Each structure stands twice: as C-alpha cells, then as structure tokens.
Design a protein with these regions (language model features):
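Long, low-hydrophobicity, solvent-exposed regions enriched in small/turn-prone and acidic residues
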Residues: 39, 66-69, 86
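Core alpha-helical transmembrane segments of integral membrane proteins
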Residues: 59-65, 72-81
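Repeated loop/turn-to-beta-strand initiation elements of outer-membrane beta-barrel proteins
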Residues: 72-78, 103-109, 159-165, 172-174, ...
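Post-signal peptide N-terminal segment of secreted/secretory-pathway proteins
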Residues: 80-97
Length: 380
C-alpha cells in the first residue's frame, strides 16, 4: 500500500466516524428496531477497536458490525453480522453469527468467509499487532483464508473453568502479501515483510475441544491455569492433534513473583501446514522471529522473575523451545533444533503494554538482540 493510498484511506474513513454511535439515514427510512421492536446496534470503523486493523496481507481493513436481538421459539437470540474489506487485496471478509446465550452456556452457529491467523489465541488480527505492523513494519501473524460454517457450544462457570466444543466445515486457501506501506518505511526504506505461510488447499471437516481451568484468586498466594486443546479433521487430509499449556504464578517476597509456563503439542496423521505447531515471537519464544520453529510436535518452557514498581513491572526472563525436523514443513520454519533466549522486559498500565529486549542464544553477537513492543490482556 503506497503513501497515496494511505491518504485516500484516511480521507474516506475519517468522515464515517460518528461519536454519537448513530447512523444517519433519510426521513423515510425505518430502522429494524422501529419495525420489529428488537434491540439493535450498528458500529463503524472507529467505534469498535476490532473494526479497523492493519496487516501485510490486507493493508488497512475497515469494517462494520450490526447486531439485532429478536425473539425466537427458543428465547432471545442475537444475530451479529460483520463485514470488512482489505484495501490492499480488495477482498471482503464476511461473518454472520446466530447466538443463544444463558448465564452459563453459549451456542453459536456461524457462517464465514474471512482472513484468519494460524494462532487465534495470539491475537494477530487485533489492535496490538496492527499497531506494530503499521508503525514498525513487524507483523507477527501468518494468515490464510477460510470459508465455511461452524457450530460452537461454550460453557463457563464462576470457578473460572470453561469448556468449548466446536464442529466445523471449512475450505482453506492461501493468501499473498499485498501491502507495502509502514510508517517506518516513510522514514527509512520500504520494509521487507516476512513471507506468509503456505497452505494445504481444500475442505476440512472436523471438531475441536478446548478445556481451560484457572485457580487462585488472591495475588498473595500462588495462581495457575491450564489449557487442553484437541482437534481432529478429515477431508483433504486426515489428522488429529493435542496441545497442553500450563502456567504458575508464585509470589516470593513483597512486590516480586516468579512466573513459570510450559507447553507441549503432538499430532498424528497428515497434518495440514496451517495446522502445524509454530514457535517464535513474543507469545511463544522471545528473541526469535515468528515461525522460527515448526512441525508436527513441540515443547516449550518459559521462566520469569518480575518486580513491581510504581511505574510498572520489570522482569528478567528466559524462554526455551524445541521442534523436531519434519519434511512436510520444509520452507515454513527456519530451524529445527532446541533454541533458548534470555532478556528483560517492562510492562505498564497493569500489564497492558509490554516492552521486551531479548537475546537469542543461537548466536553470540549484538545483532541477536530483538526488541518487541506489544499489547497483552486486551479486553476485546
């Protein structure tokens, strides 16, 4: 995306923003709420943080979100539609969700045609990664396009335990890098993006189960959480994979704590490239670029000592990860060995904004230092 395109984007999008949260229409237009009596909301671009994003595939992607809550034979439901357009690749993203929700359960039927990231939990399509991609030319996500339907049932409890079961039918296809604009590129030179991940094209029918458990509410005592994820699919290829992630937060003295994290993953069958385990970047292996390791199985550990001050939290940390060689992932991962890193970090605003300086121990030279700035625990 060129600088001229950026000017066009800003000129066209800024007038859309309406602080009052309303959408102007003519006198003869009647809203869904007026006709049906059902509550409804419509939001554009700047009115929600998930309606404007930036990445190396789409460039800027402004969107709109509309929701209506009609009555039905099974009680009130919410119908939510989202649409956005990548201004660099000119491809639309569409999603329609039908949700029935109670105090503990949520059932959602979805239809979608959209860009997605290989690691949904890392939030690469959210605000934090969009900022670093636009400003610094560092996009940690890897993307592909999926089209299909899904049915999801989720349950949560006051004990901080949750269960999610999802059944899906999806068609996957690769995406090319289309954007070439960053703010840093205006100052220095045109950025060279990381190549996007390859994709095994085809239909995949399957299901997934996520079980999460958290314990410990008092920060003066140990706190922990565990996540178990299972997924299986058939169609273009047949596969199954399982992942386990656990973390423990232990206070040691006043304003100081130790945080430990470990994860393992394995798979059987013909695992698609987009369903492989990939490590690298702030969320899995600091000090290394995303997708430095990848394959059909992995193991990783992380240790951190944090001291709280009035201005934020200062930490010393070390990460380690391993992924064995697998010929199916040639060209998608940069390395196949055990990697380690050490570093220091600063987090401010109750751990919302993080700054990390990490040194990968693969090479003992100053150029092995990597700086990262990112958002964490974003409540959207």
């Amino acid at each position: 995306m060129s600088a001229a395109t950026l000017k066009f984007v800003l000129c066209c999008m800024l007038p859309i923003y309406s602080p009052g949260g309303t959408v102007p229409f003519g006198q003869n237009w009647y809203s869904i709420e007026e006709v049906s009596g059902a509550p409804r909301t419509i939001r554009w671009v700047f009115q929600r943080p998930d309606l404007l994003r930036y990445n190396r595939v789409e460039g800027f992607s402004p969107g709109v979100r509309a929701q209506i809550r009609p009555q039905s034979p099974v009680g009130p439901i919410s119908v939510t539609g989202m649409a956005s357009l990548g201004l660099a690749n000119l491809k639309p993203n569409l999603r329609l969700d039908f949700t029935r929700e109670t105090l503990q359960d949520r059932i959602t039927f979805s239809g979608f045609h959209e860009l997605t990231a290989i690691d949904e939990r890392a939030g690469h399509l959210k605000l934090g990664n969009s900022i670093t991609a636009l400003v610094a030319g560092r996009d940690d996500g890897d993307y592909y396009r999926q089209s299909g339907v899904s049915l999801e049932w989720a349950r949560s409890s006051i004990e901080q335990n949750s269960l999610r079961i999802r059944v899906f039918g999806e068609y996957h296809r690769p995406e090319k890098i289309e954007s070439d604009f960053t703010i840093w590129g205006l100052i220095n030179e045109k950025p060279e993006w990381r190549p996007n991940i390859g994709v095994d094209i085809g239909w995949f029918l399957g299901s997934s189960i996520d079980i999460a458990s958290k314990w410990g509410l008092d920060p003066l005592f140990p706190q922990g959480q565990m996540l178990v994820s299972l997924e299986g699919g058939a169609g273009t290829s047949e596969y199954a994979r399982v992942g386990l992630l656990g973390s423990l937060d232990i206070p040691i003295v006043r304003d100081m704590r130790i945080s430990l994290e470990a994860g393992v993953g394995a798979s059987i069958g013909d695992l698609p490239i987009q369903r492989g385990w990939y490590l690298g970047g702030p969320s899995t292996l600091r000090g290394f670029p995303p997708r430095v390791l990848g394959g059909a199985k992995f193991a990783r550990v992380r240790g951190e000592v944090t001291r709280s001050f009035f201005f934020g939290d200062v930490s010393l940390f070390s990460d380690g990860a391993w992924a064995p060689y697998d010929h199916r992932f040639d060209g998608e991962a940069d390395d196949h060995r055990t990697l380690f890193s050490v570093g220091s970090g600063l987090s401010v605003l109750d751990q919302l904004i993080h700054f990390d300086a990490s040194w990968n121990l693969r090479y003992f030279r100053p150029s092995s230092v990597r700086l990262d700035a990112y958002l964490d625990f974003v409540p959207f």
